[in-house]
């Protein structure tokens, strides 16, 4: 059953929330040591939450619209009384003293927090190999990376260790692992979801979002976490839609979708074959297909990383070892140190105008071109990641690693929503279809993904 069917089953007393938690705990007990997905699991707390929900249902009391659904949370999102390490030695003794806004919203709707998932150290990576706790295995492609930086969250869903997981997406960190693990991942419009309680990698790019095995889980999670937050300055005012309303859609009649030639050109041929078949399903469902060009694709990666380096350097200055943990430069991994050192260099007064300000100008060009493209179409569709996940332990240069991000950083630079859903497989390895829309058209992506699932 899909996530919303399970929710209905719990609310209709066909299964209990406690049974749901126990089923996931059993899988974690059997597989987590091998897969290294959850860094911390609080079985007692999760079972206690579940029993309270079951009691309310038995007594005919009102329950939330996530009642009994189980969540895994990325290790850079604050959850009270859990170790929130961002998978770094720097924070290995930092206990969350409060809940991030998204956690409070999940709990308010009777969602159950089961534990904390692995990730790339400080979200700086695309493979979940840089974690100080060791790499996470890909349940859908054994021996290969799950993607990153939210690799533990994607793997938790793929391994059926939770119903829904939360991740953060700076340049594809939800969509990249969703593609590699064959699950659904969603990066909302920038500002649609509060970032209060997130350990930032890059303030102007980061966004919290959900991962699940089907679109109904994404829609339910968005209904809970997408809202204005007066404590977080980047959240947007305005009423959010009911994302579950799109799950009833059966057709894409009247929707125009665009394929970008440049996205195809940078993607491996066998991935394009799988993605093209998926796009054809959208056309069969009634969508009109057009081809567009994106002139600024070569600007995207250098622009993204220049901004990322500077904002990451600024964000990590608070990890100086005085209040908790260690000084970050003394204990961090190679990729985190690289970003700090480059960010420090670019941030110097004599270089800021030469690099950072030009990156901001390039970002404006990218945003303007994407938004102009989306004025004439409803959605942009194409590959999520241009190449297959490498084998764990393979040595890649930094530029080879960054190449995973070329198609996903665009949404972060432009602030637009984007989702990834399994398009198919190449030699048994999942590949994703990425769907992007203009700002605040998140619902259109949910609709397209739901119709695609029904077509399959």
From Swiss-Prot:
<keyword id="KW-0436">Ligase</keyword>
<dbReference type="GO" id="GO:0030956">
    <property type="term" value="C:glutamyl-tRNA(Gln) amidotransferase complex"/>
</dbReference>
<keyword id="KW-0067">ATP-binding</keyword>
<dbReference type="InterPro" id="IPR036928">
    <property type="entry name" value="AS_sf"/>
</dbReference>
<dbReference type="GO" id="GO:0050567">
    <property type="term" value="F:glutaminyl-tRNA synthase (glutamine-hydrolyzing) activity"/>
</dbReference>
<dbReference type="GO" id="GO:0005524">
    <property type="term" value="F:ATP binding"/>
</dbReference>
<keyword id="KW-0547">Nucleotide-binding</keyword>
<feature type="active site" description="Charge relay system">
    <location>
        <position position="149"/>
    </location>
</feature>
<comment type="subunit">
    <text>Heterotrimer of A, B and C subunits.</text>
</comment>
<feature type="active site" description="Acyl-ester intermediate">
    <location>
        <position position="173"/>
    </location>
</feature>
<feature type="active site" description="Charge relay system">
    <location>
        <position position="74"/>
    </location>
</feature>
<dbReference type="InterPro" id="IPR023631">
    <property type="entry name" value="Amidase_dom"/>
</dbReference>
<dbReference type="InterPro" id="IPR020556">
    <property type="entry name" value="Amidase_CS"/>
</dbReference>
<comment type="similarity">
    <text>Belongs to the amidase family. GatA subfamily.</text>
</comment>
<dbReference type="GO" id="GO:0006412">
    <property type="term" value="P:translation"/>
</dbReference>
<keyword id="KW-0648">Protein biosynthesis</keyword>
<dbReference type="Pfam" id="PF01425">
    <property type="entry name" value="Amidase"/>
</dbReference>
<dbReference type="InterPro" id="IPR000120">
    <property type="entry name" value="Amidase"/>
</dbReference>
<protein>
    <recommendedName>
        <fullName>Glutamyl-tRNA(Gln) amidotransferase subunit A</fullName>
        <ecNumber>6.3.5.7</ecNumber>
    </recommendedName>
</protein>
<comment type="function">
    <text>Allows the formation of correctly charged Gln-tRNA(Gln) through the transamidation of misacylated Glu-tRNA(Gln) in organisms which lack glutaminyl-tRNA synthetase. The reaction takes place in the presence of glutamine and ATP through an activated gamma-phospho-Glu-tRNA(Gln).</text>
</comment>
<dbReference type="InterPro" id="IPR004412">
    <property type="entry name" value="GatA"/>
</dbReference>
């Amino acid at each position: 059953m899909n996530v919303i069917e399970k929710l209905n089953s719990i609310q209709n007393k066909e299964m209990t929330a406690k049974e749901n938690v126990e089923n996931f705990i059993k899988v974690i007990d059997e597989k987590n040591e091998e897969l290294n997905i959850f860094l911390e699991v609080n079985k007692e707390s999760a079972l206690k939450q579940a029993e309270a929900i079951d009691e309310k249902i038995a007594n005919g009391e009102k329950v939330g619209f996530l009642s009994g659904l189980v969540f895994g949370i990325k290790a850079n999102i604050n959850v009270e009384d859990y170790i929130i390490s961002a998978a770094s030695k720097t924070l290995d003794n930092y206990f969350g003293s409060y809940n991030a806004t998204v956690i409070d919203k999940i709990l308010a709707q009777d969602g159950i927090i089961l534990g904390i998932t692995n990730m790339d150290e400080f979200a700086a990576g695309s493979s979940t190999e840089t974690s100080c706790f060791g790499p996470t295995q890909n349940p859908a492609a054994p021996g290969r990376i799950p993607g990153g930086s939210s690799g533990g969250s994607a793997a938790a869903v793929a391994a059926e260790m939770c119903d829904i997981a939360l991740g953060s997406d700076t340049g594809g960190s939800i969509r990249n692992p969703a593609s590699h693990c064959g699950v659904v991942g969603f990066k909302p419009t920038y500002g649609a979801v509060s970032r209060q309680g997130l350990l930032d990698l890059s303030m102007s790019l980061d966004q919290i979002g959900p991962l699940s095995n089907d679109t109904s889980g994404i829609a339910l999670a968005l209904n809970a976490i997408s809202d204005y937050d007066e404590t977080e300055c980047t959240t947007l005012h305005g009423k959010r839609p009911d994302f579950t309303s799109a799950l009833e859609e059966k057709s894409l009649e009247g929707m125009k979708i665009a394929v970008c030639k440049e996205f195809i050109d940078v993607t491996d041929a066998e991935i394009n074959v799988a993605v093209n078949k998926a796009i054809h399903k959208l056309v069969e469902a009634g969508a009109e297909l057009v081809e567009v060009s994106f002139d600024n694709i070569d600007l995207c990666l250098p622009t993204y990383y220049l901004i990322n380096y500077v904002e990451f350097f600024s964000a990590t200055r608070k990890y100086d070892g005085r209040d908790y943990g260690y000084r970050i430069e003394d204990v961090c991994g190679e990729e985190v140190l690289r970003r700090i050192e480059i960010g420090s260099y670019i941030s110097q007064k004599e270089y800021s105008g030469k690099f950072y300000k030009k990156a901001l100008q390039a970002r404006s060009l990218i945003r303007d071109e994407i938004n102009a493209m989306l004025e004439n179409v409803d959605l942009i569709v194409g590959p999520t990641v241009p190449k297959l996940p490498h084998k764990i332990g393979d040595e890649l240069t930094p530029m080879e690693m960054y190449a995973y991000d070329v198609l996903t950083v665009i949404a972060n630079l432009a602030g637009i929503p984007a989702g990834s859903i399994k398009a198919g497989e190449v030699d048994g390895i999942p590949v994703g279809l990425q769907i992007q829309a203009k700002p605040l058209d998140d619902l259109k992506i949910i609709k397209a993904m739901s119709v695609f699932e029904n077509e399959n």
